[in-house]
Amino acid sequence: MTANRKELAVERAAKKEAVEQLNGVFKTTSVAVVAQYSGLTVAQMQKLRQQMKQAGASVKVSKNRLAKIALEGTDVVAIGPMLKGPTVIATSNDPVAAPKVAIEFAKANEKFVIVGGSMGKTVLNVDGVKALASLPSLDELRGKIVGLIVAPATKLAQLANAPAGKLARVIQAHASKGEAA
């Protein structure tokens, strides 16, 4: 085997591994957002990755041809036609995390243009991604639900304690009148 053939074999193996890794990400994600990033600096891309990571999402940049192969057999296969030019794919298990960060990043960076996305088998245009981004996150929803559950118990405890408190104030007022007389 010549040196060129060895290099090609190694390159082919690396591409196959990249496709398998991407396929695993696409199979387990609930939402994918596709954006074009032509002209972004390395620092801006690092900031995007950091913001996505903080939100529980991730960003993948790969060759479009490899990404299209990796999409096969996944729920988000519909984003394949959106992969044109320098594209980035943001994914998350929380259906709101990746869209929310992508929309905020696009507002601050005009060279980051959202093309569309997919939530499961549902294809999203730019407006669909914006709509998802405007929804509360799973953690926010959980907090609201806990608040709704806890609020009645708190009010019930306040109501149960209120008559005893009123009685104590009446007795105190009566005792104060007796001392003044």
UniProtKB/Swiss-Prot annotation:
UniProt cross-references to SUPFAM superfamilies, sorted A to Z: Ribosomal protein L10-like
Which of UniProt's keywords are assigned here?
Ribonucleoprotein, Ribosomal protein, RNA-binding, rRNA-binding
Q: Which residues cross the membrane?
A: none
Pfam families according to UniProt: Ribosomal_L10
A GO cellular component annotated for this chain's UniProt record is:
cytosolic large ribosomal subunit
Under the subunit heading, UniProt states: Part of the ribosomal stalk of the 50S ribosomal subunit. The N-terminus interacts with L11 and the large rRNA to form the base of the stalk. The C-terminus forms an elongated spine to which L12 dimers bind in a sequential fashion forming a multimeric L10(L12)X complex.
NCBIfam families per the UniProt record, alphabetical: PRK00099.1-1
The entry's family comment says:
Belongs to the universal ribosomal protein uL10 family.
Q: Which GO molecular function, any one, fits this protein according to its record? A: large ribosomal subunit rRNA binding
Q: Which HAMAP family match?
A: Ribosomal_uL10
Which superkingdom heads the taxonomic lineage of this protein's source?
Answer: Bacteria
This protein's species is Bradyrhizobium diazoefficiens (strain JCM 10833 / BCRC 13528 / IAM 13628 / NBRC 14792 / USDA 110)
According to its UniProt entry, one GO biological process term is: translation
* Keyword Transport assigned: no
What is this protein called in UniProt?
Large ribosomal subunit protein uL10
